């Protein structure tokens, strides 16, 4: 079960990724985490990435694809994986396909921009575990405390309105075209594509995902 989640920042991907990972026992692969661990481990790819980053350059698509290929060979990916934050552009999606990384499901979370802004501004996180809450839509049992540990919740630096609006503009320009790309891939039977109404309750969306993925 190899899954890509698409949708603007704040569309609810993180919450549902957590649900999918727990229910189906597949790892969530974040390109940011992969880069950091490859650099830390001093692997050949990690050293190449570090050299680029040290010179203030962006890590190339080829290098990220190579990291993804290396990561999905690991034992925890034998039943599949969930890709987080990649691909972001059509060239990246093409490169992934050319590298033989096939995807079973593309799930697109659709939410209007104004609701996304409301969602992100109210978001609270438990940094050590990555658990995500919302003061209105998905509140913790005790205000501003993590349900599991009871530790204080925090606000991400990126969760301020001006930054959110900039990220939405970037998403619509860069990543939104992937929706039609994967719809065409699904028509050609290369993958299965599902549009998810992300404005509903967390539990309703999780239920729909279960029906799709079971």
Swiss-Prot record:
EC number: 2.7.4.3
GO biological processes: AMP salvage
Principal subcellular localisation of the protein: cytoplasm
Annotated region described as NMP, given as residue ranges: 30-59
Enzyme category, top tier: transferase
Matching PROSITE patterns: ADENYLATE_KINASE (PS00113)
Keywords carried by this UniProt record: ATP-binding, Cytoplasm, Kinase, Nucleotide biosynthesis, Nucleotide-binding, Transferase
Gene3D superfamilies in the record: P-loop containing nucleotide triphosphate hydrolases
CC annotations in GO: cytoplasm
Disulfide bonds: none
Catalytic activity: AMP + ATP = 2 ADP
Coiled-coil regions listed in the entry: none
GO molecular function: adenylate kinase activity; ATP binding
Pathway: Purine metabolism; AMP biosynthesis via salvage pathway; AMP from ADP: step 1/1
Localization annotation: Cytoplasm
Keyword Nucleotide-binding recorded: yes
Amino-acid positions noted as binding AMP in the UniProt annotation, renumbered to this chain: 31, 36, 57-59, 85-88, 92, 156, 167
Annotated stretches, region: LID: 122-159
Binding of ATP, residues: 10-15, 123, 132-133, 200
InterPro entries from the UniProt entry: Adenyl_kin_sub, Adenylat/UMP-CMP_kin, Adenylat_kinase_CS, Adenylate_kinase_lid-dom, P-loop_NTPase
Assembly with partners or alone: Monomer.
Protein family: Belongs to the adenylate kinase family.
Domain commentary: Consists of three domains, a large central CORE domain and two small peripheral domains, NMPbind and LID, which undergo movements during catalysis. The LID domain closes over the site of phosphoryl transfer upon ATP binding. Assembling and dissambling the active center during each catalytic cycle provides an effective means to prevent ATP hydrolysis.
Function noted in UniProt: Catalyzes the reversible transfer of the terminal phosphate group between ATP and AMP. Plays an important role in cellular energy homeostasis and in adenine nucleotide metabolism.
Annotated NCBIfam families: adk, PRK00279.1-1, PRK00279.1-2, PRK00279.1-3
Protein name: Adenylate kinase
Lineage, top ranks: Bacteria, Pseudomonadati, Pseudomonadota, Gammaproteobacteria, Enterobacterales
């Amino acid at each position: 079960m190899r899954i890509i989640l698409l949708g603007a920042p704040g569309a609810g991907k993180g919450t549902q990724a957590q649900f999918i990972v727990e229910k189906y026992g597949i790892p969530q692969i974040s390109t940011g985490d992969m880069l950091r661990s490859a650099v830390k481990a001093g692997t050949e790819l990690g050293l190449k990435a570090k050299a680029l980053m040290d010179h203030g350059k962006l890590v190339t698509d080829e290098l990220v694809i190579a990291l993804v290929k290396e990561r999905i060979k690991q034992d925890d990916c034998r039943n599949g994986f969930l890709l987080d934050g990649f691909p972001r552009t059509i060239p990246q999606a093409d490169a992934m396909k050319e590298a033989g990384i096939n995807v079973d499901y593309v799930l697109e979370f659709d939410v209007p921009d104004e609701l996304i802004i409301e969602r992100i501004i109210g978001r609270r996180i438990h940094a050590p575990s990555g658990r995500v809450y919302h003061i209105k839509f998905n509140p913790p049992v005790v205000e501003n405390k993590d349900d599991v540990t009871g530790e204080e919740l925090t606000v991400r630096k990126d969760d301020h309105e001006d930054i959110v609006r900039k990220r939405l503009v970037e998403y619509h320009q860069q990543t939104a075209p992937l929706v039609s790309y994967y719809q065409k891939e699904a028509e050609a039977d290369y993958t299965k594509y599902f549009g998810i109404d992300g404005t509903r309750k967390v539990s309703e969306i999780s239920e729909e995902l279960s029906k799709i993925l079971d």
